[in-house]
UniProtKB/Swiss-Prot annotation:
InterPro entries named in the record: CCR4/nocturin_mRNA_transcr, Cnot6, Endo/exonu/phosph_ase_sf, Endo/exonuclease/phosphatase, Leu-rich_rpt, Leu-rich_rpt_typical-subtyp, LRR_dom_sf
Enzyme Commission (EC) number: 3.1.13.4
Any one biological process term the GO annotation gives: nuclear-transcribed mRNA catabolic process, no-go decay
Catalytic activity: Exonucleolytic cleavage of poly(A) to 5'-AMP
Principal location class: cytoplasm
Protein name per its UniProtKB record: CCR4-NOT transcription complex subunit 6
Localization of this protein: Cytoplasm; Nucleus
Sequence ranges of the LRR repeats: 52-73, 75-96, 98-120, 121-143
GO cellular component: CCR4-NOT complex; cytosol; membrane; nucleus
Organism of this sequence: Homo sapiens
Binding of Mg(2+) 2, residues: D412
Length: 557
């Protein structure tokens, strides 16, 4: 960070005076810079209404103070306050996070507000000619002194981690969507989906707005496990779980609370030494053993599938096969104690009920929309194979009127709701010429992943055969990923209809709280990941028991 190239203002500050003819023709004036000079002692309050300004030149005046209202100029990237008589700076200056240059040379500054450390995009900080304390000067004069000084200020902004824990964000509200069906056998269970931000990705280069102590895994993991445990979900799907942390932290903590789990690291782990392998991240699924028993577990390696199904496609080999993302799936059996019978009906027992829970983390790069879409197709194809194979081993009485095993799919898809990935999942398929394929030649290999099979008729469309619905319908969650330069929905919980329904979901974090606290991105000392967790309560509709003379009887095994 910053990712965009910064172009400083032209020092000549050339201007053009609009002619009367241009004005008569309705030409609009545009000026993004303002210079005020002439030994000015105070500034008009109307200056702070010019929020369109990107550069403000106030050097060589007689200003002794800068009002806090300067923070209203939120588009400023350049601010020159050099050669004035400024003795102190307002803390609100730290909220001007768009600043790339801040010139404070030749003033009377003895100290700097710690809030200045929030200016993580600042590239130039001029402090020469100020009677600053020696510790600040020492940092500033080191190589890469501006960055070191800003990091020091940010890390000390809140004093210690202890002090910040008293200002917790407001609880996220629970949104009820519908009541459970009391007319038939059902089972209620809850699902959490959460990208916990792996330690090796939590760097100051990516998250310069977050203090280094709040990026530290030992600090973040406490809040992460607290969030997981407070939701008390029956099924927990996590992405970006470091291998070592799965075994030494997550599995240990969650087993104590009655969970069992399954984890697989990304494919690169297989080529690494044991020491390196510890730091590879992957996907994990945890489930409460009082509610489910494990029947099968599966790992889906997308690069292996790409290689096996390339069909001569260079794009499949050069773009998909080179990415080491994975997915995992567990086939669970619902314990009979979790089944709720209609009121007044005796609990006569039932055949075993299976459910497949899948979890995946797709490639991150926005330039690789084709890869995300192909990875999603491969994953759903493998999930369908797992379900079909497991269904063949079950009696029809177990599957009931639905004829298949229900699916819960959790994922960080790294794809927005208007993407080909989400269109594919939610509508049942996608056109082979969809724009997200970037006109690359995938057609022959994609037919392998269509529900019609390699020899089936695609009619120009790749389908998956499930009827999937998102637990979080449009508008319920404005974003699941919240960083300074990206805020959007990329995490999802899908489930198969008609066996499953959503009864309720955990709503978003209060946006007003984020704004009022000037939280421009996460992680943050109070928010441990750059993702917000998803949490939904689902209802599983179970098959009716076989009837003899109108009486329900348990199915025979």
């Amino acid at each position: 960070m910053p990712k965009e190239k910064y172009e400083p203002p032209d020092p000549r500050r050339m201007y053009t005076i609009m002619s009367s003819e241009e004005a008569a023709n309705g030409k609009k004036s545009h000026w993004a810079e303002l210079e005020i000079s002439g030994k000015v002692r105070s500034l008009s309050a109307s200056l702070w209404s010019l929020t369109h300004l990107t550069a403000l030149h106030l050097s060589d005046n007689s200003l002794s103070r800068i009002p806090s209202d300067i923070a209203k100029l939120h588009n400023l990237v350049y601010l020159d306050l050099s050669s004035n008589k400024i003795r102190s700076l307002p803390a609100e200056l730290g909220n001007m996070v768009s600043l790339r240059e801040l010139h404070l040379n030749n003033n009377l500054l003895r100290v700097l507000p710690f809030e200045l450390g929030k200016l993580f995009q600042l590239q130039t900080l001029g402090l020469k000619g100020n009677p600053l304390t020696q510790d600040i000067l020492n940092l500033y004069q080191e190589p890469d002194g501006t960055r070191r000084l800003l990091n020091y200020l940010l890390d000390n902004l809140s004093g210690t981690a202890k002090r910040i824990t008293t200002e917790q964000p407001p609880p996220r509200s629970w949104i009820m969507l519908q009541e459970p069906d009391r007319t038939r056998p059902t089972a209620l269970f809850s699902v959490m989906c959460y990208n916990v931000l792996c330690d090796k990705y939590a760097t100051r280069q990516l998250y310069g707005y977050c203090p280094s102590w709040a990026l530290n895994w030992d600090y973040r993991k406490k809040a992460i496990i607290q969030e997981i445990l407070s939701c008390n979900a029956d099924i927990v799907s996590l992405q970006e779980v470091e291998t070592e942390q799965y075994y030494s932290f997550f599995l240990v903590e969650l087993k104590e609370r009655g969970y069992n789990g399954f984890f697989s690291p990304k494919s690169r782990a297989r080529t690494m030494s044991e020491q390196e392998r510890k730091h590879v991240d992957g996907c994990a699924i945890f489930f409460k053993t009082e509610k489910f028993t494990l029947v099968q577990k599966h790992t889906v390696e997308f690069n292996q599938l790409a290689m096996a199904n390339s069909e001569g496609s260079e794009a499949m080999l050069n773009r998909v096969m080179t990415k080491d993302n994975i997915g995992v799936a567990v086939l669970l059996e619902l314990r009979k104690e979790s089944i709720e019978m209609p009121s007044g009906k005796p609990h006569l027992g039932t055949e075993k009920q299976l459910i497949l829970v899948a979890n995946a983390h797709m490639h991150w790069d926005p330039e690789y929309s084709d890869v995300k879409l192909v990875q999603t197709m491969m994953f759903l194809s493998e999930v369908k194979n797992i379900i079909d194979k497991a269904s063949r081993n079950l009696k029809s009485s177990v599957l009931g009127e639905f004829g298949t095993i229900p699916l819960v799919l959790c994922a960080d898809l790294n794809s927005l709701p208007d993407s080909g990935v989400v269109e594919y999942l939610s509508t049942g398929g996608v056109e082979t010429n969809h724009k997200d394929f970037k006109e690359l030649r995938y057609n022959e290999s994609l037919t392998n992943f269509s529900c019609h099979g390699k020899n089936g008729t695609t009619n120009g469309r790749i389908t998956h055969g499930f009827k999937l619905q998102s637990a979080y319908e449009s508008g319920l969650m404005p974003y699941t990923n919240y960083t300074f330069d990206f805020k959007g929905i990329i995490d999802y919980i899908f489930y198969s209809k008609p066996q499953l329904n959503t009864l309720g979901i955990l709503g978003p974090l209060d946006h007003h709280w984020l704004v009022e606290n000037n939280i421009s991105g996460c992680p943050h000392p109070l928010i441990p990941s750059d993702h917000f967790s998803l949490f939904a309560q689902l209802e599983l509709l179970l098959p009716f028991l076989p009837q003899v003379n109108g009486i329900h009887l348990p199915g025979r095994r």
